[in-house]
């Protein structure tokens, strides 16, 4: 879907993932942090620091009672285009499919997830928020097993969920473009992406 609006260019690529309770979600949590948790994350290093084609690149998994999405977000750095950042995201996805993360990289992510989780439980309000969050999703008792499940995620699990869910037939792409840039974007769009509908505001 391509949307014309008075705004800077922006892209969202969403892949469909299962509902809470599915065992793949722990590997997807790890994968989300691997891609965009901090300045050492893969998207930041590749797209913002090395290639300098984006001012923002982020990925997150949306977990709920119902099937949801794993979404990549990016905004190009002028004069680079949405097509360039989209291509760069697909390149990072292919890297994930072709090689598992290193032991060091995987352990770093697990340490970050554990630290963030424990930090959220350090106050009464934080603990209440986490219990409420897990109860709304399914069962508050998930709070007792979350870190153990994350610790069990292997590098092969991370590569496996990337191969399983990050496929062309499982994605939806939305692009926000300025009206005057719409023609240029269409001319440079990736050949293997399905035709988009355009909405003008």
Where are these regions (language model features)?
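Short beta-alpha junctions and helix-cap segments that line functional grooves
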Residues: 30, 59, 160-162
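His/Glu-based metal-binding/catalytic segments typifying zinc-dependent metallopeptidases
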Residues: 1-42, 198-201
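M16 family metallopeptidases and their MPP-like homologs
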Residues: 8-19, 45-151, 171-177, 184-187
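Helical mechanochemical/support elements of P-loop NTPase systems and associated helical scaffolds
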Residues: 39, 81, 154-157
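Proteolytic maturation boundary segments
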Residues: 1-2, 145-201
């Amino acid at each position: 879907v391509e949307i014309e609006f008075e705004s800077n260019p922006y892209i969202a690529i969403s892949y469909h993932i299962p509902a809470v309770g599915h065992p793949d979600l722990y590997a997807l949590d790890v994968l989300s942090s691997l891609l965009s948790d901090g300045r050492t994350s893969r998207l930041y290093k590749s797209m913002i620091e090395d290639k300098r084609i984006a001012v923002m690149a982020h990925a997150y998994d949306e977990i709920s009672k119902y099937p949801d999405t794993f979404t990549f977000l990016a905004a190009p750095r002028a004069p680079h285009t949405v097509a360039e950042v989209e291509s760069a995201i697909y390149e990072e996805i292919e890297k994930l499919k072709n090689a598992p993360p290193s032991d060091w990289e995987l352990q770093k992510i697990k340490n970050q997830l554990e630290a963030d989780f424990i930090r959220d439980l350090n106050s009464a309000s934080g603990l209440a928020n986490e219990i409420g969050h897990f109860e709304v999703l399914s069962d508050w008792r998930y709070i007792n097993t979350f870190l153990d499940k994350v610790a069990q995620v292997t590098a092969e699990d991370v590569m496996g969920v990337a191969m399983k869910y990050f496929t062309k037939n499982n994605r939806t792409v939305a692009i926000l473009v300025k009206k005057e840039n719409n023609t240029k974007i269409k001319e440079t769009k990736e050949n293997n992406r399905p035709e988009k509908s355009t909405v003008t505001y």
